[in-house]
Regions:
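Sec-dependent N-terminal signal peptides
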Residues: 4-12
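Sec/Tat signal peptide C-region and signal peptidase I cleavage site
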Residues: 14-18
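Serine-esterase "nucleophile elbow" of acetyl-processing enzymes
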Residues: 20-90, 104-112
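Structural recognition of the beta-strand scaffold that forms the well-ordered cores
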Residues: 44-48, 53, 86-91, 115-120, ...
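Solvent-exposed loop/turn segments at secondary-structure junctions
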Residues: 51-55, 92-98, 122-127, 156-160, ...
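Cell-envelope and extracellular/periplasmic
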Residues: 60, 89-95, 117-125, 182
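Active-site segments of SGNH/GDSL-like serine hydrolases
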Residues: 119-123, 139-174
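Catalytic His-Asp segment of secreted/periplasmic serine-dependent ester chemistry enzymes
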Residues: 156-251
Length: 251
């Protein structure tokens, strides 16, 4: 049974061994999610960005329930059954970070995020590194003024670019986002490095994509797996994988 569980976790995209070094900065949120009524409260996960968190697949089709914001909600609720959790997307398809920064105070902060995710790099190629940097910094600073924990995401793939090219635009934006996460001490989901490693290992990234620049359900699950590091302790992660294994076996 143990070996079947490990095998199915691997097939589902859940890297069990990768969960040994858990991030510690979001301990307070994990504690909040464990509280029962009447001591609990609503926890808001806010996803700000472009078409990918919005759930766009093969445009104009939108598959909200397959996108990583919903996948994260499902997984978090599986492990924290007493938590009241909202997954809120303030993302807009086709938008870049400058546009997202302009509506940040009016449309994002009023949701009172407990965790804020920012995912804009795919579309920031159109405005360049310097303008993107200013926009990301503006959003980060405004959120940190309100003591909101932030998780920055590097981009998911665009098949029209060579992900193995270290000088590609998306690689440059990824490096900039990593520096921002370091400088502002935010969380980081390095989607780009993860997919790049898959390509280096010989995987065909087409299996993760709905179209050239939008992930499919399997591609979103790669992102979800990375995000869940911030929500699960190792024991909780193992419990979640076991539940997923049992669900598959019953089908």
């Amino acid at each position: 049974m143990k070996y079947l569980y490990l095998l199915l976790c691997t097939l589902l995209g859940f890297d069990v061994m990768a969960q040994t070094g858990q991030p510690s900065e979001f301990t307070q949120i994990r504690q909040e999610l464990q509280k029962k009524w009447p001591d609990n409260r609503t926890v808001n996960l806010v996803f700000h960005g472009h078409s990918v968190p919005s759930g766009y697949a093969n445009t104009p089709n939108v598959k909200t329930l397959q996108a990583y914001p919903h996948q994260v909600l499902e997984a978090v609720k599986e492990i924290y059954p007493y938590a009241v959790v909202n997954s809120i997307t303030t993302s807009i398809g086709g938008e870049n970070a400058e546009q997202g920064a302009k509506r940040f105070k009016q449309e994002v902060l009023p949701h009172r995020p407990d965790i804020l995710f920012i995912d804009y790099a795919l579309n920031d190629r159109s405005i360049g590194l310097e303008r993107a940097l200013k926009a990301w910094e503006k959003m980060i600073k405004e959120a940190q003024k309100q003591n909101i924990p932030i998780i920055l995401l590097t981009p998911t793939p665009d098949l029209t670019e060579d992900i193995l090219d270290d000088k590609s635009p998306l690689e440059q934006h990824s490096r900039q986002i990593r520096r921002l996460a370091h400088d502002y001490k935010t969380g980081l989901i390095d989607c780009y490095a993860t997919f790049k490693e898959k390509r280096k290992n010989g995987e065909n990234l087409n299996i993760y994509m709905s179209q050239s620049n939008h992930p499919n359900e399997k591609g979103h699950r790669v992102v979800t797996k990375l995000i869940l590091n911030y929500f699960f302790e190792e024991a909780q992660w193992n419990e979640y994988c076991q539940k997923q294994t049992m669900t598959i076996m019953k089908k």
